[in-house]
Amino acid sequence: MAISKEKKNEIIAQYARHEGDTGSVEVQVAVLTWEINHLNDHIKQHKKDHATYRGLMKKIGHRRNLLAYLRRTDVNRYRELIQSLGLRR
């Protein structure tokens, strides 16, 4: 199931850098993280769903690239985002 419009707007409101911000790295990573967590739960129940697993791997790679970009450009924003999302335990 895809992310609902309400849930996506809630995530955007929480991580937006300014009003109307939907494309900043923080927002993109937060939305991807929600989708990755949701797909992880699906994969745990449906172990043979290889198409979804491939989509999950693509999303993880996209998030990894965005986080690498953010770390290169602004380390403080990167650390705050990692902390708030609970990544890199």
Swiss-Prot record:
Assembly and interaction partners: Part of the 30S ribosomal subunit. Forms a bridge to the 50S subunit in the 70S ribosome, contacting the 23S rRNA.
GO cellular component terms, semicolon-separated: cytosolic small ribosomal subunit
Source organism (scientific name): Streptococcus agalactiae serotype V (strain ATCC BAA-611 / 2603 V/R)
Gene Ontology BP terms: translation
Domain of life: Bacteria
Keywords of the record: Ribonucleoprotein, Ribosomal protein, RNA-binding, rRNA-binding
Name of the molecule in the record: Small ribosomal subunit protein uS15
InterPro entries in the cross-refs: Ribosomal_uS15 (IPR000589), Ribosomal_uS15_bac-type (IPR005290), uS15_NS1_RNA-bd_sf (IPR009068)
Cysteines paired by S-S bonds: none
NCBIfam families linked to this entry: S15_bact
Function: One of the primary rRNA binding proteins, it binds directly to 16S rRNA where it helps nucleate assembly of the platform of the 30S subunit by binding and bridging several RNA helices of the 16S rRNA.
Keyword RNA-binding tagged: yes
Family named by the database record: Belongs to the universal ribosomal protein uS15 family.
A Pfam family the protein falls into: Ribosomal_S15
GO molecular function: rRNA binding; structural constituent of ribosome
